[in-house]
Swiss-Prot record:
Pfam families reported in the protein's UniProt record: UPF0147 (PF03685)
Family statement: Belongs to the UPF0147 family.
Protein name in UniProt: UPF0147 protein TV0625
Lineage summary: Archaea, Methanobacteriati, Thermoplasmatota, Thermoplasmata, Thermoplasmatales
Length: 89
C-alpha cells in the first residue's frame, strides 16, 4: 500500500516537473532545471533518497533566483514540498 502511494507521489512530481519544463512564462534556466530534475529522478541506479535530495537542491536554487516570477516560484515550492514528502516515505 505504501509503495503505491509512493508511486503516485512520484508520478505527480514527474507530471509537475513536466508541466514546469513546458511553461514558457518562466525563464529558460528554470525550464532546463525542471527537465534535468526529471532526468535525475528517472535514474534508478541511485537510491530514491539521494535522487530526491539532489533534485531538491537544484529546485531550491531556482526558487531563490530573483528572476523567477511568483507563479513559477509557487510551482517550484509545490514540487519541493512533494519531493520532501517522497523522500521521507
Amino acid at each position: 500500500m505504501v509503495m503505491a502511494m509512493d508511486q503516485n507521489l512520484f508520478n505527480e512530481v514527474m507530471y509537475l516537473l513536466d508541466e514546469l519544463s513546458q511553461d514558457t512564462t518562466v525563464p529558460k534556466n528554470v525550464r532546463k532545471v525542471a527537465q534535468d530534475s526529471k532526468t535525475k529522478l528517472s535514474q534508478e541506479n541511485e537510491s530514491l533518497d539521494l535522487r530526491c535530495a539532489t533534485v531538491l537542491s537544484m529546485l531550491d536554487e531556482m526558487a531563490n533566483d530573483p528572476n523567477v516570477p511568483s507563479h513559477g516560484r509557487t510551482d517550484l515550492y509545490t514540487i519541493i514540498s512533494k519531493l520532501e514528502a517522497l523522500a521521507k516515505s
